[in-house]
Swiss-Prot record:
It comes from Blochmanniella pennsylvanica (strain BPEN). Keywords: Ribonucleoprotein, Ribosomal protein, RNA-binding, rRNA-binding. Pfam families: KOW, ribosomal_L24. Disulfide bonds: none annotated. InterPro entries: KOW, Rib_uL2_dom2, Ribosomal_uL24, Ribosomal_uL24_CS, Ribosomal_uL24_KOW, Translation_prot_SH3-like_sf. HAMAP family: Ribosomal_uL24_B. Transmembrane segments: none annotated. One of its GO terms (biological process) is translation. This is Large ribosomal subunit protein uL24. GO terms for cellular component: cytosol; ribonucleoprotein complex; ribosome. Part of the 50S ribosomal subunit. GO terms for molecular function: rRNA binding; structural constituent of ribosome. Coiled coil: none annotated. Belongs to the universal ribosomal protein uL24 family.
């Protein structure tokens, strides 16, 4: 499998789907499935059963569902648009950079 280009806490933008154009932070990455969970993106309603042991009430809750990696791109704040990620080696360490302007991904 290729190197992980999107990581936790990255600022990403949605490229396609019902939330196209929205931005959010990556909460969780499922590398083996090629999917990510982004805060505030792809909200679905889930019918939750009450769990009395944990004092969790039942009802309909909204939560984030996963999004395919192909439908998101990292957000470049200097250019204010979606960008691609490349890798380079600096001081013996492999770091991620934005392809368009060569800035280091923070």
């Amino acid at each position: 499998m290729a190197a992980a280009k999107i990581k936790r806490n990255d600022e990403v933008i949605v490229l396609s789907g019902k939330d196209k154009g929205k931005k959010g932070k990556v909460k969780c990455v499922f590398y083996n499935k090629g999917r990510v969970i982004v805060t505030g993106i792809n909200l679905v309603k889930k019918h939750q059963k009450p769990i009395p042991n944990k004092n969790q009430p039942g009802g309909i809750i909204e939560k984030e569902a996963s999004v395919d990696l192909s439908n998101i791109a990292i957000f470049n704040p200097t250019l204010n648009k979606a960008d691609r990620i490349g890798f380079t080696i600096q001081n013996g360490k492999k770091i991620r950079i934005f392809k368009s302007n060569g800035d280091i991904v923070k």
